[in-house]
């Protein structure tokens, strides 16, 4: 993602509706919330998985040196067969090796379900931004979409999960003041 993403905490925001804030800073499982909103018609569509050089903001979020290599997984979280959320999850190669945690085996499973079902993972603070359009897949690319990220840690392993809320989610949730 371009370096112009400005990640903010809740206390750094102004003029955001309480309804949107509730979605952005909900510390529960987004997968579970989306599944409930979709009345069970939820699925994960993998878009990209593999080793890549991590983006500068990702290296900073994982406390690893700039230019570090890591596993990158990009997916859509669908409700009623519409992409509601674009998610990009990354973990540094140095932390993954020997961790026993293999992101490559997830397939169409939700990473969130895995993280929330393993009590050894601790979630760090949630940060939000207006996600740069250049970091989104072409078919959903738009300016000004809300994104959030947080780091899940288990010992030396950190997994940084970023989620971008797409207009189709807000439509389904009946939220107009985005």
From Swiss-Prot:
It is found in: Cytoplasm. Belongs to the UbiC family. It comes from Pseudomonas aeruginosa (strain UCBPP-PA14). Substrate binds at residues 73, 111, 163. Removes the pyruvyl group from chorismate, with concomitant aromatization of the ring, to provide 4-hydroxybenzoate (4HB) for the ubiquinone pathway. Pathway: Cofactor biosynthesis; ubiquinone biosynthesis. It catalyses: chorismate = 4-hydroxybenzoate + pyruvate. GO terms for molecular function: chorismate lyase activity. Pfam families: Chor_lyase. This is Probable chorismate pyruvate-lyase. It is an enzyme of class 4 (lyase). The gene is ubiC. Keywords: Cytoplasm, Lyase, Pyruvate, Ubiquinone biosynthesis. Its EC number is 4.1.3.40. One of its GO terms (biological process) is ubiquinone biosynthetic process. GO terms for cellular component: cytosol. InterPro entries: Chorismate--pyruvate_lyase (IPR007440), Chorismate_lyase_/UTRA_dom_sf (IPR028978).
